[in-house]
Amino acid sequence: MALPWELEEDILSRLPPISLVRFRTVSKHWNSLFNDKTFINNHLSRSRPEFIILTNSKIYSVDIIDHNNIDPTIRLHEIPTYDIHSRGTDLNRTIINTCDEFLFYNYRYWDNMTALWNPWLRQVRWIEYANQEFCVFGLGYDNSRPEKVYKILGHLFCHGKVLRDQKVVIYECASDSLRFIDRPEDDDWPITETAKRSNVSLNGNLYWFGCSNYENDEYYIRIFDFSTEDFKPFCLLPCQMSHSTDELVLAVYKGDRFSLLKQCSVTREIGVWVTKERISNDNGNGGEGVEWLKLMTLSKPNLPKLFGTVSYFIYGKTLYMCNGDDETALACIYIVREDVCKKFQIGSGNINCRHCVYTPNLLSLPLFIG
């Protein structure tokens, strides 16, 4: 007896993409779901964040098993590399983060290697720009338009000029063209290497930490608005650094808000704040236009000392982090809540890696048609 089609769809929408892709050939009906926007959105709403980890030779996804269980664990999947690794394996030059539901891969400016990537659909779209002196910062789009026309923010590297004097550039993906825009008038230029690795994309805009006073470590959130193509302060942080070696990490929370993680470098205590309202172009005015709520404080004695690039997400009342081990520098997944602090090492030996948080989905890559 065949199940009703609506029930089949509901069951399939709860499966991870790695399983769904295998079922495409079962029937024409099932295969058609990959082009059904309602099904794709239902599936995305039920997907949970994972970690994507790039090493010099392999790419992994790390899924959390039994989120709400008393003893959560992880599941490691090796992802086919396609031609990602064939173009470059020096991870010191590699940046990976997300723009909406896509992975954004960049292998620095001198190698002309930038791509959007959906590993579950086995899709990679390389963005080719003729000028190899283009140093990429991040990807976004004008959110005032009904369709998403993607753009890349960066600067042209001009030999013989100091970084402060580099020209700010927008690369138009649809027309394959570069054009200059005005440089920020304040001192927050050039964008630091740390900001390039840790910027956050939300609603088509890029966000990162700016500093109004480096002597006193006074940080705030800056935005590059792709609709107006300008740099500006977005909002103040709910906390400041107590020590110059404290860690501050910005992330997307529940798809439309921000979370902020702070770790004290002395006590290793971790605090997490989240924004009360969803983030939009209008609720940040450079000051106190965004309201933050303290979500959790974690002060276990075996908390790791976070350093370098930190990826994290919050699910329920649990904090999930990817970072190097503070003794061996090996990539590790940490699961932390009031009653749990677990560490899982990824691989063995001296593994250099890049990582980010990513929600698996069935969204096809854009064609970059304006």
Curated annotation (Swiss-Prot):
| Residue ranges occupied by any F-box domain in the UniProt entry | 1-43
The annotated consequence of R257Q reads: In son1-1; confers resistance to pathogens such as P.syringae and P.parasitica
Record SMART domains? FBOX
Which GO BP annotation is one of this protein's? response to bacterium
Q: Could you say which tissues express the protein in this record?
A: Ubiquitous, at low levels.
Pfam families reported in the protein's UniProt record: F-box, FBA_1
Question: What does UniProt give as GO cellular component?
Answer: SCF ubiquitin ligase complex
The UniProt keyword set, sorted, is: Plant defense
Task: Say yes or no: keyword Transmembrane present.
Answer: no
Question: Briefly, what is this protein's role?
Answer: Negatively regulates a plant defense signaling pathway which is independent of salicylic acid (SA) and systemic acquired resistance (SAR). Confers sensitivity to P.syringae and P.parasitica.
Which PANTHER family is this protein grouped with? Answer: BNACNNG10540D PROTEIN, F-BOX PROTEIN CPR30-LIKE
What is the protein name given in its UniProt record? Protein SUPPRESSOR OF NIM1 1
Instruction: Tell me which species this is from.
Output: Arabidopsis thaliana (Mouse-ear cress)
